[in-house]
Amino acid sequence: MGRLVVKREDYMATKASAIGHASVKKRIRKMFGNIHEVVDMPNLIEVQRDSYENFLRSRPEDGYVSGLEKTLRSVFPIRDFGGVAELDFVQYELEEPKFDVDECRQRGITYAAPMRVTLRLIVFEVDPDTETRSVLDIKEQDVYMGDMPLMTRNGTFFINGTERVIVSQMHRSPGVLFDHDKGKTHSSGKFLFAARVIPYRGSWLDFEFDAKDIVNVRIDRKRKLPVTTLLYALGLNAEQILHHFYNTITFVRGDGGWKVPYVAESWRGRKPFFDIINGDTGEVVFPAGQKISPRAANKAGRDGLETLLIPTEEIYGHYAAYDVIDESTGRIWIEAGDEVTPENLELLDNAGVATLELLDIDHVSTGPWIRNTLKADKAEDRDHALAEIYRVMRPGEPPTKETAEALFYGLFFDPERYDLSAVGRVKLNMRLDLDCPDTVTTLRAEDILAVVKTLVDLKDGKGEVDDIDNLGNRRVRSVGELLENQYRVGLLRMERAVKERMSSVDVSTVMPNDLINAKPAVAAVREFFGSSQLSQFMDQTNPLSEVTHKRRVSALGPGGLTRERAGFEVRDVHPTHYGRICPIETPEGPNIGLINSLATFSRINKYGFIETPYRKVVDHKVTNEVIYLSAMEESRYTVAQANAELDAEGHFVEELVSAREAGEFLMAPREQITLMDVSPKQLVSVAASLIPFLENDDANRALMGSNMQRQAVSLVRAEAPFVGTGMEETVARDSGAAISARRAGIVDQVDASRIVIRTTGEIEAGKPGVDIYRLMKFQRSNQSTCINQRPLVSVGDYVNAGDVLADGPSTELGELALGRNVLVAFMPWNGYNYEDSILISERIVKDDVFTSIHIDEFEVMARDTKLGPEDITRDIPNVGEDALRNLDEAGIVYIGAEVQPGDILVGKITPKGESPMTPEEKLLRAIFGEKASDVRDTSLRLPPGVAGTIVDVRVFNRHGVDKDERAMAIEREEIERLTKDREDERAILNRATYAQLQEKLLGQTVAAAPYKHIVKGARIDIETLASVEPHKWFKFAVEDDARQAELEAIKNQYDSADEAIRKRFEDRVEKAQRGDELPPGVLKMVKVFVAVKRKLQPGDKMAGRHGNKGVISRILPAEDMPFLADGTPVDIVLNPLGVPSRMNIGQIFETHLGWAARGLGAKVRTALEEWREANADRYEWDFSPPEVVRERMIEVYGEKYAEDIKSREDREIVEMAGLLRNGVPMATPVFDGAKPEDISEMLNLAGLDDSGQVELYDGRTGEQFDRKVTVGYIYMLKLHHLVDDKIHARSIGPYSLVTQQPLGGKAQFGGQRFGEMEVWALQAYGAAYTLQEMLTVKSDDVVGRTKVYEAIVKGDDTFEAGIPESFNVLVKEMHSLGLNVELKTSKAKDEDDSSFQVAAE
């Protein structure tokens, strides 16, 4: 028996060599950007992940309470109506999900974790006399409350086996908004100001001015009330209301007038009609009719002027601040708010009132709005006001004091019914300058007063109205919050049921389980994930479309806008979008501007506002400290652009710097700058940041470019672009398309379907020391494209955490690769590229450059019918052997079979109802249980338009139904795979553990040994270990106690890891053998996957990244294509007229730079070939170092990359040169990319003409074209609009029930409509018979079309057209209008006349 012994030196050497063979990027992108980014881009899908994580899991260590727990705590405790019992929430726990993600995808079930909630039922004893409660009994129990869907690592959900994304929603932030009607309501055109308090949930409160300048309030958009009614209801009286809004002035009677205190501010710029006299000295300070200058007013104050004497007439028109009452009789001379008139002033004079407190209303800076409202208000005190509010809210019900109180309290002050949320409170505090903790989420009296005060100030011209479209007033609700709201609704429904249950059972005997019925809560969650407008089928066309879908922000959806009602303002780009929402990427069409994409660096803060990062500027020096700001906070700063020039210390070079301040662009002096952008691409979204030379494209075309990249189909061979932007790697990594290493380690095994990595470094207890990555092989995506992953590493490679191990669909070497680089010439060619058509070379089709694989899924179910069970079988009536050639003995198609339209995929027979039976037959049937003997063929056949290869078959059986041979074979295969995994994991675990053991045992003194020949006290060496089987090494005991403890720790870790492997294996085998959960009535389900290879063909849509889209018009043989001087034919010919009017010049820059990249690649290739020739007759270990290649690479990449290239090993240099042969990849980041000078320099370096144009020759004649033509490499994409999916031909298909005309559309197997204009064309040609045929036998003449069919079958070619069915429908419609229309045939003249007479009578 061979023993496993690892020599220590060998072990360490292998470790070192493995680390030496470290992971380095196989290919370098030459970057043109100069701006160094100080902060890493946040993970692109963390928005989704963080939001859901915060919803699901509390973090006790930092005191964070999860959204789920908050929701549960807001509904519990539930008390019964009598107060005898209460059901309280203790904690919740999410268990391990029953199936993992892959199993859920295959079985079509939801990936979710069972949720257990610990509830406590407390029963009280209520003393009937004192009504005190004492606890009688407390019971705790864990209650199962349904499954909570879990998010996958990539930010998606699996609901019923399909991958879905919950899109974030943008809505109006809770808080207060001040606005005006822009003068549209009233004919005079004056602005009517309004304020609205928007809660997170609860009643809306609107304050508004009307045309008469009265301030009104509406609750929940109901009838309006004077605002003072609301203030009375809050407990204020008239005097308090007036005092809150106005200052008072004390008037004291003097000689010949009234004395008032002198306030300089109120006299500046006024022109008095009377002499203004010093109240103390009696001299004239300001003469009548002379304007008082601000300087004179201030001087008078400084000279000691304190009181003025003004004539009595001047006091008229002021308003009293208090009630003036005759103390002795209680008679009111003048009420608070009343106007002072000669009449009531005379009364006051007679009563001897010498001082008056009047309101400071000057009708200039302070208007009498609240005073006027108070006087117009019918209510006079709190009770009146409450009754008035009650009448508005509940019209027709008589108010009592208690119900009115309760209603008013419940509207705004009851946390159960009204919730501003923390966000709303923060917004309220900021707008109204209040200081209230964000835990107070109901309204307070002072909040309402502050809102009214601010509204009145606006009317008086103080302050600004808010901008609704500012991102400071719109917030984002992500998955967690949306689900939390939905779950709360479900829990509240459940609460009602629980309360009713509590009052109907004996609480002392039941357990919490008997009271709770979790169905409403579970249904709410299921409904949210299954059918909410924001839960969408994930766009899986390519990795970019996945990432953008998860980063989408929609203003539509429940509680949001609707397409029809959204105006232009909401959709428009706003200055606050900068760095938060992309101004480019949004759909064309009705949703434009309503569906947006987050910008690259933006993130969402805890209040739901979008933040973007900036670098701080301290003492005029730009630091590397980064702060994230929301739109509200940003308005205080002046922000410089990311491309502002800095010197080595970080100071601005220019005196004036291009900057943004309060939404405006300006040139600001450098001392004024307080922040600076982090990166030029923080402005745009992920898709837009992938467009090179974006800055040279028109915005409309850039929008199309970003949208079309999301529709690019993944091709059979991915190729990264020559001209990229440097974002390709980030997208590939964050989308999860390429597999990244979770932990560092050494690659142990690699094959096409899995990668096994032995982890290095410390392994956490209970975690396996082995990572197995399963690769997806030819799986179907949501869009029927093909998901296929290919390993990039080889055995023995050392990988770091985060390194790319395998490429996925549309990725190459860990970079996003949506299309292919092709050689393009810009020139017209015989009209084949007129109006954006594209002419392509046959080489592209022949070499499968744009070939893609599409996988269709077909499923068939065998159900239990009334007449007996359906059966999946090969034995089908009336079907020849030829039709069954692809089926196995179970009647299911083989994997690898090539199928054509109409071929049987799964044979299935269904029992058929027979002719009526006699009673005797029925009786026999009932006794012997025979089911129907007659069957019909209901097999699954391949629909028209699909032909391909079967790549996968899955059979699902109901629990308890016998499995057929095919199902058994699939199950055996699965178990073999699981066994192999288990054995590999064990082998690696053993290897790693024994190496550890050996390290710890060598050189130790034996205290006990597994075999007698090893004596106590001996030293352990290699020979000792070699004489014992490795699995018995655990039985060694050593004298060193510390070392012995280490050995025991290794043993415990080994045992627990081994146990985990065993358990995982058994669990998976059990799942594979267990029956599947199928829909009710289904016995068996078979899914068949057909792969179709789609080559490029005329009618397919292609596009570049700059919005330059077109349809292929012709595929031309390569020899007819225009060719270069060296004989290379171009791949694609585009029309140059497509560029000027579209203004997407980026494509021309890309062409030139791509041409240079190809030329530089050729230089590297020649160097590599020279080196290979020099070493042609040497062995590998004797090769000369590839210095010539290294030098050439340094020359191509420039000094910036010299260090990196010099530090690489010879082997890596050769490998990298091999990857650069076709072209050197370059990156030109958006807004910081290659300048025209850089492109010229690259072209010169590659030895090409720096005009970017070459002489082309006509492929058909061989003659040179008159002028040079722009030729270069463009990255072209094949879009998901394939002609194969659109074109179809109808033979005999379904007809509409009413009109009997053929249906329309491919899905209904419909015909082409011969419409009004087409009829005109035939009429114009006089083609009467053709037209008659079109309108009758080819359409809806039911009898006629049957006769035509019979005639054709008999070989006869005479037939007659009858009456179209649509004529009959018309007649019936006229009947329904009471018009009798019938067809009469005339036999003779007189008969005809008589019938007319009858009709006339």
From Swiss-Prot:
BP-aspect Gene Ontology terms: DNA-templated transcription
EC number: 2.7.7.6
Gene Ontology molecular functions: DNA binding; DNA-directed RNA polymerase activity; ribonucleoside binding
GO annotation, cellular component aspect: DNA-directed RNA polymerase complex
EC class name: transferase
Catalytic function, reaction form: RNA(n) + a ribonucleoside 5'-triphosphate = RNA(n+1) + diphosphate
InterPro entries found in the cross-reference section: DNA-dir_RNA_pol_bsu_external_1, DNA-dir_RNA_pol_su2, DNA-dir_RNAP_su2_dom, DNA-dir_RNAP_su2_hyb_sf, RNA_pol_bsu_bac, RNA_pol_bsu_CS, RNA_pol_bsu_protrusion, RNA_pol_Rpb2_2
Entries under Gene3D superfamilies matching the protein: 2.40.50.100, 2.40.50.150, 3.90.1100.10, DNA-directed RNA polymerase, subunit 2, domain 6, RNA polymerase alpha subunit dimerisation domain, RNA polymerase Rpb2, domain 2
Entries under Pfam families matching the protein: RNA_pol_Rpb2_1, RNA_pol_Rpb2_2, RNA_pol_Rpb2_3, RNA_pol_Rpb2_45, RNA_pol_Rpb2_6, RNA_pol_Rpb2_7
UniProt keyword list: DNA-directed RNA polymerase, Nucleotidyltransferase, Transcription, Transferase
Recorded superkingdom: Bacteria
PANTHER family, alphabetized: DNA-DIRECTED RNA POLYMERASE I SUBUNIT 2 (PTHR20856)
HAMAP family linked to this entry: RNApol_bact_RpoB
Annotated NCBIfam families: PRK00405.1 (NF001616), rpoB (TIGR02013)
Primary role: DNA-dependent RNA polymerase catalyzes the transcription of DNA into RNA using the four ribonucleoside triphosphates as substrates.
Subunit structure: The RNAP catalytic core consists of 2 alpha, 1 beta, 1 beta' and 1 omega subunit. When a sigma factor is associated with the core the holoenzyme is formed, which can initiate transcription.
Family: Belongs to the RNA polymerase beta chain family.
Name of this chain's protein: DNA-directed RNA polymerase subunit beta
Name of the gene this protein is made from: rpoB
